[in-house]
Every structure is written in structure tokens, then in C-alpha cells.
Amino acid sequence: MTPSTASAPRASPVREQTTVAASAGRIFGLVLRYWYVIRSSWPRAAELIYWPLVQMLMWGFLQSYLAQASSFAAKAAGLFIGAVLLWDVLVRSQLGFSVAFLEEIWSRNLGHLMMSPLRPAEFIAALMAVSLIKLLVAMVPVAFLAYFFFGFNVLSLGFAFAAFFANLIIMSWSLGLVSTGVVLRWGLGAESFAWLIVFVFLPICCVYYPVATLPGWLQPVALALPPTYVFEGLRAIVLEGAFVGHLMVKALALNVVYFIAGSIAFAYFLRSARIHGTLVQMGE
């Protein structure tokens, strides 16, 4: 056989599956699957929008009432609405991450995914992307209605909004990693943990009031949480018109620690689930 007719050596199938392009393709395929599920069911999309809309309207009307009776509330116009919108960024992103994972269990598909070429890191990346998609589906209409009803434009915060958004998203992913890891290890008996974990932080993160409002012994706990700095930063902008950059730096530093800890926890729970055989029993 001449060199011109000799067939070129083909890459190993294993090597083909480990390329960056193959990894990106698996992530994109999983994200596309989740997107089709959302797009094909209007009740799912309506559910994503419902609670953020109700919260925004409730706090917005309360703020309008207080502004008529209090000079401080009039000065702080947009404080409650901004706080509830940012809080919902954290909540919707974490739930978007966790619920996408739970849907794999409910459909008894998790074991198939774990036996496929899909790597755990790729699965996590897909869940992160899906959480962003669900967040946009939920919050874009609500933010528009906040401007329509109350004249509050979240984009008027400028660069500060980008910093707030990024820090809350990273924190939501950290919570999502821990909550899904717990469900991996202990099964659907721990499902409520995935739904409730973010709300544990609501009174401690000082969403609607400053850190100084908390008891002295609880303030260090609040200051150890990244969202606290986000909401303190929001109050600084609304009340003083100043963007306090060092608050965002502290939030980012804490987020790095929490995200690494969440990743380690997820890897540990996944390994434990494989050892104890709970992966194949999910959904049964």
C-alpha cells in the first residue's frame, strides 16, 4: 500500500471524548435539553415569574405607602424594591440550580447521566448555565414591571448592579452545590434541604435592614456571608449615592472561599453516594 493510499491514523474514541470541544458539546446538549423543557411548558415559565412578581408588588406598594407617611421612606425610594429584586436573584439562581438537578432525580435520569461520558464538572457547568437562564426568564419581566409600577430601574445602579449580580450568583451556586450534594448522598429524603437552604440566610443577610440592627453576637455571622455586603452596598448607593468598592471586594473574597468549599462538599458527597450505591436508587 502506497503512502498516498494509506489511511491516516484515527484518534482514540476516549481521546475524542476528552477534548475541550467534546466537553463543551456535552454541556451545551444538557443545557439545550433543559431549555426545551422550559420553552415547551408555559406553566413552568409562569411559575418562575410568579413569586418574584408577587414579592416585588408587595414590597413596592408597602414602600409607596411608607413614603407618604415618612420622610426617610421617601428619601429611600427604591430601597425595598431594589432589595427584593437582588434577593430574588440569589433565590431564583439557587433554586434554578437545585431544581434542575432534582428534575433529573424525579425523571430517574440521574443514574444514566452519571454512567454517560458526562463528567461531574460538566454537569455542574450545565446546572450553572441553566440557573442563569431561569433567572433571566424570571427577573427580566419583573424588573420591567418594577419600572412600570414604581419607576425603579435596576440598571440605573450601573456598575454596582453588575457587582451585586455577580456576587449573588456565585453565592447561589455555592449553596446549590452543597444542597445537591446532600441530596446525592441522602436521596429525596433530603429534598427539602435544597428548597430551604437559601431562606436560612434571609434574616442574617440583612436584606431589608442594616447589620447594626442585629444583636451584637450575630453581627459577625452576618459579616461572614457575601450577600450581607451586597445589601449593605445597595443601601450605601440608595441612601448616600456612593458605591463602596471594598464591600464588593470582601464579598468576592468570601465567595471564592464558599465556592471552593461547595465544590469540595459536592465532590465528597458524590463519592460517598457512589460508594453507598445511592445513585442507582435515586427516584425509587
Descriptions of predicted regions:
Residues 2-284:
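Hydrophobic transmembrane alpha-helices and immediately adjacent juxtamembrane helices
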